[in-house]
C-alpha cells in the first residue's frame, strides 16, 4: 500500500462539554482508511476551520500519507509567516490524523511507532477549585478518594476570589467589565490555601499551582519565595512568554520547581529556557505547536537538558488530543506528569475509546493509531456554541488590562 494518498480533509466542530472542539478527518484513497486529529483552538475555532478547509486541504490533496515530516514542513511554510496558534492548530489536526493513519497501516498503537513504552501507565493530575477553602478541601478529598496523588490547587479560578473579598475592589467610574483581580489579595489567599492544604492533607500529597502569568515580575519572585515552604511539585506559568528570561533570576533565588509553556507556539520561546535549565517541566499544548511531529522533537530536546514533559491538558482539548499526548507520555523517557481534566459521558459517547483512569494513572489500549474514534452522528447532537470569553479579560483593580 505504497501509493496511498490524501483524498479529502474534513473538519468538524462539536461541543459535547459545552466547549467547542475542532476535529480533523483525513480521508485517503483507500475508502476504509482514515485518521482523526485534534485542531482545537477554542477561542478562534472558526479561523482554524477556515485555515484547514480553504488552504491546507486544497494544498494536500493527492499527497502521500506516508510522508508526514515533509507534509508538516510544507504546511508550516505554506503561508510564509508561521508559528501562530491558528495555523499551528490547523497543522496539528492534519498531523495527528496522519499519525493515526500510519498506526492503522502498521497495525500498531502510536506509542509503538515512537519506540515503545517507557512505562505502563501515565501519572495524571487533576484540578481542585472552589469559592472558599472548604470547597477546595472537599474537592481535594474527592480526588484523593478516587486515587489521585497529584492535585493542582486553586481558589476561585485564576486570580483567586480572596475568600470572597473580590467584591471589596473598587473600580474607577466608567471602568470596563472584566475578570478583576487584586495581585496582593490573590497571593495572600494562595499562601493561606496551601497552609491549610498541608495542615489537613499532609506532605505525601503532591500539589501544584498555576499563576497563569498574571503577576508582575517582582510580585512573581516574591510569591514564589513565599510558596517555597510548601514544597510544590511545580509552580506553573509564572511568567508570560515574552518575559521568560526572568526565569534566570528566579532560578537563582528559589528552589521551587517551574513548569512553563502553555502559551508557547514556537521554538524561539522554549529553546533558551530549556538549554539553560531554568525550568523543570515543559507545558506546551501539542496542537498549539503543530501536533505530534514537533512534540516528539521537543520531548527529545528537553531530555538532553533534564527537563521533563507535562503537556497541557485542559478541558478545551478533545479526547483525541489528550490520547495523543498520553502516547507520548508512555514513550518519552523524560515524562514528568500529565494534566487531565476528565471526560464527560457525552464526550465518551462522541469519542469512543477514551483512555481509562485508575488510581491516578491513565491507560491507553493497543488499538492501532491514536486509538480514539469519532462518532460523527453523535457529535452532530452537540453543535458549536457561543462561549463566555469574560475570564480572558483580566484586569487590575484600576481597570488596567492584564494579558498572559
Curated annotation (Swiss-Prot):
Disulfide bond positions: none
UniProt entry keywords in alphabetical sequence: Magnesium, Metal-binding
GO MF annotations in UniProt: magnesium ion binding
One GO term (biological process)? amino acid catabolic process
InterPro entries xref list: DgoD-like, Enolase-like_C_sf, Enolase-like_N, Enolase_C-like, Mandel_Rmase/mucon_lact_enz_CS, Mandelate_racemase_C, Mandelate_racemase_N_dom
Functionally, this protein is described as follows: Has no detectable activity with D-mannonate and with a panel of 70 other acid sugars (in vitro), in spite of the conservation of the residues that are expected to be important for catalytic activity and cofactor binding. May have evolved a divergent function.
Query: Signal peptide location in the record?
Result: none
Output this protein's name.
D-galactonate dehydratase family member CLOBOL_02770
SMART domains the record matches: MR_MLE
Q: Which PANTHER family match?
A: D-GALACTONATE DEHYDRATASE-RELATED, STARVATION-SENSING PROTEIN RSPA
Which parts of the sequence bind D-arabinonate?
212, 262, 283, 312, 339
Q: Which family does the similarity line name?
A: Belongs to the mandelate racemase/muconate lactonizing enzyme family. GalD subfamily.
Binding residues annotated for Mg(2+), in chain numbering = 210, 236, 262
Amino acid at each position: 500500500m505504497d501509493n496511498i494518498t490524501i483524498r479529502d480533509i474534513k473538519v468538524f466542530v462539536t461541543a459535547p462539554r459545552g466547549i467547542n472542539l475542532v476535529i480533523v478527518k483525513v480521508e485517503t484513497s483507500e475508502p476504509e482508511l482514515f485518521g482523526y486529529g485534534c485542531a482545537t483552538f477554542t477561542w478562534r475555532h472558526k479561523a482554524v476551520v477556515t485555515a484547514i478547509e480553504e488552504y491546507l486541504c486544497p494544498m494536500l490533496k493527492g499527497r502521500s500519507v506516508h510522508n508526514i515530516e515533509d507534509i508538516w514542513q510544507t504546511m508550516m511554510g505554506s503561508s510564509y509567516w508561521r508559528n501562530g496558534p491558528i495555523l499551528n492548530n490547523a497543522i496539528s489536526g492534519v498531523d495527528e490524523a496522519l499519525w493515526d493513519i500510519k498506526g492503522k497501516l502498521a497495525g500498531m498503537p502510536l506509542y509503538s511507532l515512537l519506540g515503545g513504552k517507557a512505562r505502563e501507565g501515565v501519572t495524571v493530575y487533576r484540578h481542585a477549585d472552589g469559592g472558599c477553602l472548604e470547597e477546595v478541601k472537599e474537592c481535594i478529598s474527592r480526588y484523593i478518594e478516587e486515587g489521585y496523588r497529584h492535585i493542582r490547587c486553586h481558589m476561585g479560578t485564576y486570580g483567586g476570589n480572596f475568600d470572597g473579598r473580590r467584591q471589596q475592589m473598587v473600580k474607577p467610574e466608567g471602568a470596563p467589565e472584566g475578570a478583576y483581580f487584586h495581585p496582593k489579595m490573590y497571593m495572600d489567599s494562595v499562601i493561606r490555601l496551601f497552609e491549610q492544604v498541608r495542615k489537613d492533607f499532609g506532605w505525601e500529597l503532591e500539589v501544584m499551582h498555576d499563576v497563569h502569568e498574571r503577576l508582575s515580575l517582582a510580585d512573581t519572585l516574591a510569591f514564589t519565595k513565599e510558596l517555597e515552604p510548601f514544597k510544590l511539585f511545580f509552580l506553573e506559568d509564572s511568567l508570560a512568554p515574552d518575559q521568560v528570561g526572568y526565569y534566570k533570576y528566579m532560578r537563582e533565588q528559589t528552589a521551587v520547581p517551574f513548569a512553563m509553556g502553555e502559551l508557547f507556539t514556537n521554538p524561539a520561546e522554549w529553546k533558551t529556557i530549556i538549554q539553560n535549565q531554568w525550568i523543570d517541566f515543559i507545558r506546551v499544548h501539542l496542537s498549539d505547536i503543530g501536533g505530534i511531529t514537533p512534540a516528539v522533537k521537543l520531548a527529545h530536546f528537553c531530555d538532553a537538558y533534564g527537563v521533563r514533559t507535562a503537556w497541557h491538558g485542559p478541558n478545551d482539548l478533545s479526547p483525541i488530543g489528550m490520547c495523543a499526548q498520553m502516547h507520548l507520555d508512555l514513550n518519552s523517557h523524560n515524562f514528568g506528569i500529565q494534566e487531565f481534566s476528565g471526560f464527560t459521558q457525552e464526550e465518551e459517547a462522541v469519542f469512543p475509546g477514551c483512555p481509562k483512569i485508575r488510581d491516578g494513572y491513565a491507560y491507553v489500549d493497543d488499538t492501532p493509531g491514536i486509538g480514539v474514534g469519532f462518532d460523527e452522528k453523535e457529535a452532530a447532537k452537540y453543535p458549536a456554541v457561543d462561549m463566555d470569553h469574560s475570564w480572558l479579560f483580566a484586569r487590575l483593580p484600576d481597570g488596567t488590562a492584564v494579558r498572559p
